[in-house]
């Protein structure tokens, strides 16, 4: 296919994806206030006395728009992923097509697991520690900006969703021969430190560090295991 045809196809797929995103965001706007109530739950459970306040007349509108865009992207993600698949499908071999779908579904599942883990486990613990530090140690008045709180929640949820993609990324890199399971195994001791540092950045108390580091370490071990399976299968095919 000529380059102009590729660019035309890419443009078409991007337009469809953008339209799906805009439609999804428009639909999500009607449910944004309900999503906001869900996002408020962790802080209300951690510190019921906290009052969420707005700092400008336009802040409530921008908060609803921010939530709508985030939820709209989730709603549109099946369409966006399908357009991505249709764009790259002609360039893939049959065995690559068979491998791509499980990887795609696996990445979606892992992202959702990471987001749910952040919302139900990490967020309440982080809020309890961070707000406790401010309200009890510094004797600060328990008021929080709604916009800053929602931004914090969305960033944390997305960050853990992306972090949970680690097995997929490392599996692909190992399958492509960029890195080996042996290299990952030798890097394990450094990754343990990295996992606990990440936990310390979010909430420096020991129990929260451990709770956040354990899933990352498990995902790392799963990545090594999947890489060993991939390289073993590749060697068997080469021998045959």
UniProtKB/Swiss-Prot annotation:
Keyword Transmembrane set for record: yes
Membrane-topology descriptor: Multi-pass membrane protein
Superkingdom of origin organism: Bacteria
Any one Pfam family match given in the protein's UniProt record, by short name: TatC
Subcellular location: Cell inner membrane
Keywords from the UniProt entry: Cell inner membrane, Cell membrane, Membrane, Protein transport, Translocation, Transmembrane, Transmembrane helix, Transport
Regions crossing the membrane: 15-35, 61-81, 103-123, 152-172, 191-211, 212-232
Gene Ontology annotations of biological process type: intracellular protein transmembrane transport; protein transport by the Tat complex
Presence of the UniProt keyword Transmembrane helix in the record: yes
HAMAP family assigned to the protein according to its UniProt record, in alphabetical order: TatC
Family (UniProt): Belongs to the TatC family.
Protein name (database record): Sec-independent protein translocase protein TatC
Lineage: Bacteria, Pseudomonadati, Aquificota, Aquificia, Aquificales
């Amino acid at each position: 296919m000529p380059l102009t045809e590729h660019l035309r196809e890419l443009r078409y797929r991007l337009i469809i994806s953008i339209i799906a995103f805009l439609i999804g965001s428009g639909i999500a706007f009607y449910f944004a206030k309900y999503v906001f109530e869900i996002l408020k739950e962790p802080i209300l459970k951690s510190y019921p006395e906290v009052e969420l306040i707005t700092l400008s007349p336009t802040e409530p509108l921008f908060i609803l728009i921010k939530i709508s865009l985030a939820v709209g992207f989730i709603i549109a993600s099946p369409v966006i992923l399908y357009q991505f698949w249709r764009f790259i499908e002609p360039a893939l071999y049959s065995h690559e097509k068979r491998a791509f779908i499980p990887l795609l579904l696996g990445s979606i599942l892992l992202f959702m697991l990471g987001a749910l883990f952040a919302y139900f486990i990490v967020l309440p613990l982080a809020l309890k520690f961070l707000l406790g530090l401010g309200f009890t140690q510094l004797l600060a008045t328990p008021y929080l900006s709604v916009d800053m709180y929602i931004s914090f929640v969305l960033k944390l949820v997305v960050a853990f969703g992306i972090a949970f993609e680690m097995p997929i990324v490392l599996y692909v890199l190992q399958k492509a021969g960029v890195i080996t399971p042996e290299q990952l195994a030798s890097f394990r001791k450094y990754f343990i430190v990295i996992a606990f540092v990440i936990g310390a950045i979010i909430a420096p108390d020991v129990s929260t560090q451990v709770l956040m580091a354990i899933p990352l370490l498990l995902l790392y071990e799963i990545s090594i295991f999947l890489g060993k399976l991939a390289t073993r299968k590749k060697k068997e095919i080469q021998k045959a």
